[in-house]
Amino acid sequence: MKRKDILELLRDIKPYDKGTHMMWTDPYIAKQLLEAHLDPTIDAASRNRTNVRRTLDWIDNQKVNENNDLLDLGCGPGLYTTELSKRGYNVSGYDFSMNSINYAKKVAEDEGLNIKYECMDYLTMTNENEFDIIMMIYCDFGVLSLDERNELIKNIYRALRPGGVFIFDSLNSKFVDNLKVSKSWDISEGGFWQEKPYTCLSEWLHFEEIRGTLEQHIVIDEVNDYKLYRFWNHYFSLEDVKNMFEAHNFRKIEKFEGLLEDDDSVTFYKIKK
């Protein structure tokens, strides 16, 4: 890969431009992600266990009826679904990573829990009137483009029973206040991105016109082949969220601040059908 090729990749990026590869379906990276999910001390693929517990306790207070059929979108290896099942919920979990789903299924089997897991893209879900609570945690809602968000909201509305709620968290403007638009590079003999030696060029950008951010990584191997990973996210205000969900006939939108320990850049929302 020549210098001019790198510059071309980084030049004139448009909102929602995609990378060349997906992290979630790469077998090697999937193993690294699972390790990050399961490390209780860090906020990497999942939040640290203190904040997971605080979130679970809050969700537990949002019960809407005695059925409590709950769906976790982007459930990962089951950090939330496992505990919610133990607390008496009828739990289902969808995730795009087969590696995470297989791990979650094994945990449920070992602990004798009846949790329904599926490896799937939640943008294609077709459930109707099945759930009282649908949740989406770790700011996953914000990674979607505008069209994808609208598609997901339609799916969620259809899948919820009357009076059911959608619970999610998102970045807020305080995240942008602390965002450092920057570039960095790393040389590794083998690490997170691949087992063999590589150089990784990383960049963080702010796209104010879409209230979005981009984190991108160009991973270059020993023979100058490369993979480009792009991760978009968005930050929302209460007004943004109201506009999105009221357009799809949701009736009540509530926001909750201060749920996470030492992190005021994330807001939680409860949306009622």
Describe the predicted segments one by one.
Residues P77-R87:
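Conserved SAM-binding loop of SAM-dependent methyltransferases across substrates and taxa
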Residues E111-L123:
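Conserved SAM-binding strand-loop segment of SAM-dependent methyltransferases
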